[in-house]
Amino acid sequence: MNMAETQLNPIARPTAPAGFDPAQSGQSQAPSRPKIEINDLNFFYGKYHALKNINLQIPEGKVTAFIGPSGCGKSTLLRTLNKMYALYPEQRAEGEILMDGENLLTTKRDISLLRARIGMVFQKPTPFPMSIYDNIAFGVKMFETLPRSEMDDRVEWALTKAALWNEVKDKLGQSGYGLSGGQQQRLCIARGIAIRPEVLLLDEPCSALDPISTGRIEELIAELKSDYTVVIVTHNMQQAARCSDYTAYMYLGELIEFGDTEKIFIKPVRKETEDYITGRFG
């Protein structure tokens, strides 16, 4: 991508608000094929206004990172994408989250089917209390009826994609709890991709891991984007710079700046972003 292509422009909207200054907006339009388009998103924890008028296009087949200080709303934004908040009546989202033209906030689609399309891996590895094999097969069985031979192939495929197969192929019947922390997190990623989602959400996937395990997860993220749209929340700015194609900086529930990762880290538009990137704030 050349410098001309990385110039930050305002996110495409039907009309621009009065006084809108593209040079100061800090927001860029993602490539022409956004996988997810977020329009005027607001989110509330009861009366607390956690996300404020978020407009963002998440490009297909790329890695997008959400960065910002603790409490800025990046994990909240991530969890709106597959409606994790639906478990809590006091939480609500307003606006649009469009995926293939469908508003995920108002769709009548079964929530489990939505989460099959948009998988999620959490901060702490969460293997199920069952064998390594069954950890992978469990989700698949919810949506597909496969003969044993095909299930075996799916399990091997998912573990291979997660760079774990060679380490566990001789102990598939053993508990997932017996794996190291890094292996457990890769098991959770394998479990997520086994149902073949279109989007994979990663919420601080390396925060509890050692540097070697973190490096393996980062290599895996780079490989996964060839098949999935990946969105990652991270406090580690170096990780965002290494892993992502696009970066969104958030502060106090607002999207401050979004654009090509290299541009965000080398020449951000907004002073708030520069202060955070350089360590003068946050």
Curated annotation (Swiss-Prot):
Subunit structure of this chain's protein: The complex is composed of two ATP-binding proteins (PstB), two transmembrane proteins (PstC and PstA) and a solute-binding protein (PstS).
Record domain ABC transporter: where: 36-277
Function statement: Part of the ABC transporter complex PstSACB involved in phosphate import. Responsible for energy coupling to the transport system.
Enzyme class: translocase
Region (Disordered): 1-33
This enzyme's EC code(s): 7.3.2.1
Protein's recorded name: Phosphate import ATP-binding protein PstB
Family: Belongs to the ABC transporter superfamily. Phosphate importer (TC 3.A.1.7) family.
UniProt-annotated location(s): Cell inner membrane
Cysteines paired by S-S bonds: none
GO molecular function: ATP binding; ATP hydrolysis activity; ATPase-coupled phosphate ion transmembrane transporter activity
InterPro entries (alphabetical): AAA+_ATPase (IPR003593), ABC_transporter-like_ATP-bd (IPR003439), ABC_transporter-like_CS (IPR017871), P-loop_NTPase (IPR027417), PstB-like (IPR005670)
GO terms of biological process kind: phosphate ion transmembrane transport
Membrane topology: Peripheral membrane protein
Catalytic activity: phosphate(out) + ATP + H2O = ADP + 2 phosphate(in) + H(+)
CDD domains xref list: ABC_PstB_phosphate_transporter
Predominant cellular place of this UniProt entry's protein: membrane
Pfam families in UniProt: ABC_tran
GO CC list: plasma membrane
Alphabetically ordered keywords of this record: ATP-binding, Cell inner membrane, Cell membrane, Membrane, Nucleotide-binding, Phosphate transport, Translocase, Transport
Residues holding ATP: 68-75
